[in-house]
Amino acid sequence: MVRHFPINDQSLLPAHFGFWPGNSTTPGEVSNRVFSPKIPVVCRKLHSKQPFGMFKGENAMNYAFSTFLIEAIIIIFFIKVVSIALRPFRQPRIVSEIIGGMMIGPSMFGGIRNFNYYLFPPIANYICANIGLMGFFYFLFLTAAKTDVGAIGKAPRKHKYIAAIGVIVPIICVGSVGMAMRDQMDENLQKPSSIGGVVFALSFTSFPVIYTVLRDMNLLNSEVGKFAMSVALLGDMAGVYVIVIFEAMTHADVGGAYSVFWFLVSVVIFAAFMLLVVRRAFDWIVSQTPEGTLVNQNYIVMILMGVLASCFLTDMFGLSIAVGPIWLGLLVPHGPPLGSTLAVRSETFIYEFLMPFTYALVGQGTNIHFLRDETWRNQLSPLFYMTVVGFITKFLSTAFAALFFKVPARESITLGLMMNLRGQMDLLVYLHWIDKRIVGFPGYTVMVLHTVVVTAVTTPLINFFYDPTRPYRSSKHRTIQHTPQNTEMGLVLAVSDHETLSGLITFLDFAYPTKSSPLSIFAVQLVELAGRATPLFIDHEQRKEEEEEEYEEEEEEPERKQSGRIDQVQSAFKLYEEKRNECVTLRSYTAHAPKRLMYQDICELALGKKTAFILLPYQKERLEDAAPTELRDSGMLSVNADVLEHTPCSVCIYFDKGRLKNAVVRLSMDLQHSTNSIRMRQETYRFVVLFLGGADNREALHLADRMSTNPDVTLTVIRFLSYNHEGEDEREKKLDDGVVTWFWVKNESNERVSYKEVVVKNGAETLAAIQAMNVNDYDLWITGRREGINPKILEGLSTWSEDHQLGVIGDTVAASVFASEGSVLVVQQQVRNQKGGDGFLNGKFDYKRFLSPWSHSHN
């Protein structure tokens, strides 16, 4: 049985069930769950499916479930296609997802009669709309669960002032425009509650929006990114109260003071239940979870069901239905074990399957054909002017407030742009406005287009004004070569697990720190950000000094719940420092960040501490057919490459093959070892330097020179020269000669040091000379990575190199086919910054960087 939609009364189509005025009004099969007394209850004819029904004239599109499956495929396909098409323009996911949703709406394909009739009939729209709303609620819950509410109290005072100014000024300006143009608005938008809702929506920037866009732009771990998230979080906390006030105003418009009273009573009861019952339940779940494990699956299912229950309760109490999942998420202890388990178990399904239906729901209500001249003039111009004023005042107030608090101009402009980003939370607010009849579908369309345009324009501008890696390049020498002899040398040691740490400690002891030439080590443990929205960088020494303060105790809580693997690394750091405190000072850190952003913590630490080099373990690739216990984290592969590209100092990559036994670790329990230096066990270790010329090899030779003072090390330096000086750079040759001469004069009387020269014509002869060296006699191979090497010496070898982290020679001696079992150390010297820069404020503009797509995938 079928029913016809009334053509002239579109108000009967409830928006939250997915029946949009832009959809075709042709006959269609519908469910009887349409709550309107003006529409008769009808029955749907049930079809019995038959085997091979398509060959008997049966149409699968007559079934709601079959139609829903086709719709799911179309929605996800459109969004992915738009995402790929917009990637070269550096657009975040939210822009492509909204446009993909609009493609199936009346603005594009939804305006085609047959497209709606066969693929998006009303009954299937009803299913899609409800799934889309569920996607919204779970997205808000997950984002809130990653939010560190405790960071609000620890936020710097200037963040609070900037957040307040960036909200108050737009409220005053947008509110003034709204009141001045009130006579030009339709009767629904003229209400004080409606104008107030629009004003607050344009004045606040949602934390979930900032988090998702900055995550897509790889700016979560940047200074401005952290600044923006802190300011947005402060605004969101005020926004929680604004939502309650706004809902109370809408109840006052309908039911007066009596309705407002019972609404507030319901809010208090719901909030008390969440704080007194739900929060304690979460704490109990955490206490029942063994350290280092995921939360029990049954608890996760109960929490995800609780999201739906919170939606039901807030809707029943008259609150915005989104308040429930947000409040519930804020009560979840962020980070491991509960927050991280929720993210691992549900994030992919929510983001990649449920959320596309959310954007389809948004797109179905967006109809650009509503923007006609008379509609624009009579209804939409006040709303449009309010959005423009909101953007301008939000940008100017935030930027000038940041400048007042001595934030650099470039960062202030970037912060002002970030505070204008719009996204998922705003879309849900617009849908809520339709439900409350604050705006009609023309006004809703204006706000959705405002979200798309502002975010699409703002994100490239942010990239244009702000490059987080720009400060890492220093114009000062920060190298091993330029660190004076017999002075303290600083280095950053970056590790991700206990296995790689033992090899790096072995190397540090062979670097032979002494009282006269000590090492200052800044050891940072890299931990993947899980169950948290904001990156966390912990200085363990500072924590000890401030452990009596309450906020430090709160910050320590998520770390107590980390796996035992993290405790092992920190314990190893402490043990190493205790046994070598006369010649080594060590300060330990833990960096929680997304894997693709870990390099920023490493580079910022090296820059701030003015270290000579960064020491990294070589990250092996994962083998597809290997057992899970044998696999090394594939996400760490990009960390070394990013550090090599953006480093503010020299970099050493250590490939531990296990040949160098960690004698020092075994001797660490021996309290009678020398205090002047770290003596190895009485065994001689043979190191070799493959010197091919260039800055990187000069840096490697200076590091090897420090090792040569170790009485347990014999060092061989082999310099490769091209036949007839072919392909040599005169400047590099002179610099190489100077360093080699200095090294030989310094070590001429050292019987444990030898020097040789080999003349080769091409890469084949270079490789043959290396293989003829009794390669299995050497415990450590040291070489430069690539800079300044005579290309003639490597001719023919570059095509066989597979790993650019190690360079051509490093990759050759590290390969499994190479006969040596010795470990490999590859050195890259600092590339100093040439003064100047790119961007508008420097008078230069790199269009390639501006238009090139982001290299990472959106996770």
From Swiss-Prot:
Expression across tissues: Specifically expressed in pollen.
Name of the protein in its database record: Cation/H(+) antiporter 24
Compartment list: Membrane
Region (Disordered): 538-566
Xref: PANTHER family: CATION/H + ANTIPORTER (PTHR32468), CATION_H(+) ANTIPORTER 24-RELATED (PTHR32468:SF109)
Primary role: May operate as a cation/H(+) antiporter.
One Gene Ontology term of the molecular function aspect: antiporter activity
Location of Phosphoserine modifications: 857
Membrane topology: Multi-pass membrane protein
Keywords: Antiport, Ion transport, Membrane, Phosphoprotein, Potassium, Potassium transport, Transmembrane, Transmembrane helix, Transport
Family according to the record: Belongs to the monovalent cation:proton antiporter 2 (CPA2) transporter (TC 2.A.37) family. CHX (TC 2.A.37.4) subfamily.
